């Protein structure tokens, strides 16, 4: 199988999996996950090589405490279901950030592009998120991406720098059930010569 075919197979295998068990599969350790996420944060392309991506991994009591605070902060019982399942059914969460100090420095250094830099930071964060999700899936983990950003920021340990803006949460664990069927829209990529 060619490298591209292997890459595409890995990419298409990545699915949203909500049914998780709070354990790691096989011989996978949290240090393996940390190493993979660290490499992805380092190697994901960024505008002007600015490297604004940051990440932390929550496990154990910290993972449960953060998601418990998120659950309690949401008033609607229906709205509490997803963060409660993240707390109770997942092994951990990768919390993705962008460092606003980096974005502000870019704005000052390159004022002609100042309005674009926040979007550039969002784009590179999205790239790091999907790269991490695909990699964790390839390791045998299941996961789902969440965006309880303000709630998460308020619940995180105090040693997280204030300049870090929460972008997303990749909740992960061992899959407890296969993903549901995925449907596709017609969305052909056209070639114009």
From Swiss-Prot:
InterPro entries: Frm2/Hbn1, Nitroreductase, Nitroreductase-like
Cofactor names: FMN
Keyword presence, Acetylation: yes
One Pfam family per UniProt: Nitroreductase
Enzyme class: oxidoreductase
EC number: 1.-.-.-
Domain of life: Eukaryota
GO molecular function terms listed in the Swiss-Prot or TrEMBL record: oxidoreductase activity
Location of this chain's protein in the cell: Cytoplasm; Nucleus
An annotated GO cellular component: nucleus
Protein name, UniProt field: Putative nitroreductase HBN1
